Amino acid sequence: VGEDAEAKTILNGLTLDVPAGEVHAIMGPNGAGKSTLSYVLTGRSGYEVTGGSATLNGEDILDMEPEARAAKGIFLSFQYPIEIPGVPVMTFVRTAINAQRKVRGEAEMSAPDFIKKSRDVAKMLNLDAEMLKRPVNVGFSGGEKKRLEIYQMMMLEPKFLILDETDSGLDIDALKTVADGVNAMRDPSRGMLVITHYQRLLDYIKPDKVHVLAKGQIIKTGGPELALRLEQEGYDGVLGEAA
């Protein structure tokens, strides 16, 4: 994968398999390619895939537009959620749900069903009902933006979740709330990829596997104990083993 502006190779020889029902964590130093991986999987512009494949339930997604990938069930929780002035949260989310349903040939979600589900999800995430009437992320705190990302995720019910440093900027209470929402989405039919720098998120979202990404490749894979080791020793020891 290359980034057009700099013609720089970012991911090279990366192999990753996340089975349905599992939560995998990716950790690694800055510049390792963690966010780039999330961008490539979701179809963000500015990146050229020069080889390899990425499949969801056996279907290659790399030639699909971002909205088609979303309709197939891929969801990315952004590290830095953007503001959308003039578009209320509930309008935005209901439009997204029904756009995906249309692509899949399903009936639209009715207003009463949407409102009931929205209230239930908002309550779990400690989101004020008035917040959902405001423009998307406009004037929201960092923690509110992250909780709103999880609200969208729970409303859309994707098949494959990518959380890109969702824990950044969260205090411990907000972190627990976000983790509760993510854990509520764990399901035998759903895979999750959690990208993080810190062990603390993995105290609440227990991964099945932890991968270390460095220089565009996964250099080591282990269980939750690998994240604990990284927290205690840093990346140098693991990087040295892979050298």
Predicted region positions:
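The feature captures the beta-strand-to-loop junction immediately N-terminal to the Walker
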Residues: 27-29
